[in-house]
């Protein structure tokens, strides 16, 4: 069973979410503030972190940033509808996805499972080169100028999707469906924030923005 670290300061929401996830087959450890969440993470890294944006003391964005500095574990942010700016900051800090409160319990469990599937899915295919960038799908390794890059599972899946469709413009909606697994309407900010982070690692020129259409990776030369 997958282990979830739930960091949420509201006792009612924390307990309701814990019960929901456990009923759906997850093993859940909880924390009520940012530092307690980091301590719990260090005691035994979970399979996925469910992290509230607004926390007392150290906020969720700071917690996300600290976890991401040492781990590629999937992170999903919990946010109120009024926390749009904080959600963007969380995505920029390395979160893989977010869920808006209030949420339907089945939707939350489905989103966590989708993120976990993306994180564990093994790709097939031959090595690909794009200038100084090399992608090894079988080993799930990406290197730039011979140096292996540290990518989160979502960043890796996004790069691989672009690479496997090199030269083709993929819309944000296509990327949401193929990378995030959304068959319903999703927030295209997820795509934009992850492209921005990915460019910071693979090079600003590696991924081209096609205005009004989407993104593409140039065909290997």
Predicted feature locations:
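Protein kinase-like catalytic domain
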Residues: 68, 116, 163, 199-202
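N-terminal/domain-start alpha-helical segments
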Residues: 1-120
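DNA-recognition alpha helix
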Residues: 175-182
């Amino acid at each position: 069973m997958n282990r979830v670290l739930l960091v949420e300061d509201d006792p009612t929401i924390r307990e309701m979410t814990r019960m929901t996830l456990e009923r759906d087959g997850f093993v859940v450890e909880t924390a009520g503030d940012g530092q307690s969440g980091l301590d719990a993470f260090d005691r035994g890294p979970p399979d996925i972190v469910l992290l509230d944006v607004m926390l007392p003391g150290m906020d969720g964005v700071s917690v996300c940033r600290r976890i991401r500095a040492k781990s590629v574990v999937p992170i999903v942010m919990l946010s109120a509808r009024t926390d749009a700016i904080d959600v963007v900051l969380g995505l920029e800090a390395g979160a893989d996805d977010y869920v808006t409160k209030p949420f339907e319990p089945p939707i939350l469990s489905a989103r966590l499972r989708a993120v976990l599937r993306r994180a564990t899915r093994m790709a097939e295919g031959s090595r690909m080169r794009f200038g100084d960038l090399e992608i090894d799908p079988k080993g799930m390794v990406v290197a730039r100028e011979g140096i292996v890059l540290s990518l989160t599972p979502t960043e890796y899946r996004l790069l691989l999707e672009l690479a496997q469709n090199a030269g083709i413009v993929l819309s944000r909606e296509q990327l949401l469906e193929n990378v995030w697994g959304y068959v319903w309407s999703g927030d295209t900010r997820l795509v934009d924030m992850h492209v921005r982070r990915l460019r910071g690692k693979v090079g600003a020129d590696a991924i081209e923005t096609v205005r009004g259409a989407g993104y593409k990776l140039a065909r290997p030369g």
